[in-house]
């Protein structure tokens, strides 16, 4: 008898959570982790009602912040307002956390800022602490000076009942940058 369904990896669209509830009789609990973190750090635990489309909340003992990383100066600033897009950062120090990329010192230095590991995932955190995946920092296209996360556009497209799957890529444009 199936009692619990969890997912980790690519973020689930909210529609998948509703599908699980409708077809399987159980919601799908989406979770977040990276190989670099060594385990699930953010989760939709069974103790709380699921917010479909959310990655969940940090597990007890896991400190996360949303940061703004200035590409030009390298400065990292913690965003302390809810619902503002930024990069997910986790406080380092748990035993399973990787120490760096083998043979790639520059990449290793780039993802650690002080006591924080910058994940490369763009998120927003609501006032209740739930995290919402926006896209990858390296998966953003620039259109007429605006940064657009392709995952956000894909999510909007697949929320329509006539769309099963979607993929968004940037196409070079003379005046808009990408379109």
Regions found by a protein language model. Name each.
Residues 54-61, 117:
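Short coil-to-beta-strand transition motifs
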Residues 94, 99-100, 107, 122-179:
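AMP-binding/adenylate-forming catalytic core of the ANL superfamily
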Residues 58-61, 72-110, 148:
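Conserved ATP/PPi-binding loop(s) of AMP-dependent carboxylate-activating enzymes
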Residues 48-54, 75-77:
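Short, P/G- and charge-enriched loop/turn segments at secondary-structure junctions
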Residues 18, 53, 106, 155:
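Active-site phosphate/pyrophosphate- and oxyanion-stabilizing loops and adjacent acidic/basic residues
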Residues 1-51, 63:
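Gly/Ser/Thr-rich phosphate-binding loop
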Residues 68-74, 126, 174:
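Short, acidic, Ser/Thr-enriched surface-loop or helix-capping motifs
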Residues 9, 33, 56, 121, ...:
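Active-site glycine-centered loops adjacent to acidic/histidine catalytic or metal-binding residues
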């Amino acid at each position: 008898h199936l009692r619990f369904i969890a997912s980790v990896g690519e973020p689930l669209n909210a529609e998948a959570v509703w599908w699980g509830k409708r077809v399987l009789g159980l919601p799908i609990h989406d979770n977040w982790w990276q190989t670099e973190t060594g385990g699930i750090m953010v989760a939709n635990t069974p103790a709380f009602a699921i917010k479909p489309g959310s990655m969940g909340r940090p597990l007890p003992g896991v400190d996360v912040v949303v940061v703004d990383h200035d590409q030009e100066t390298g400065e990292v600033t913690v965003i302390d307002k809810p619902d503002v897009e930024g990069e997910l950062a986790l406080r380092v120090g748990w035993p399973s956390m990787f120490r760096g990329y083998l043979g790639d010192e520059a990449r290793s230095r780039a993802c650690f800022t002080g006591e924080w590991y910058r994940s490369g995932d763009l998120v927003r955190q609501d006032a209740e602490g739930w995290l919402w995946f926006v896209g990858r920092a390296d998966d953003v296209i620039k259109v007429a000076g605006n940064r657009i996360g392709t995952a956000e556009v894909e999510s909007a497209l697949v929320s329509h009942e006539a769309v099963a799957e979607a993929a968004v890529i940037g196409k070079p444009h003379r005046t808009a940058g990408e379109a």
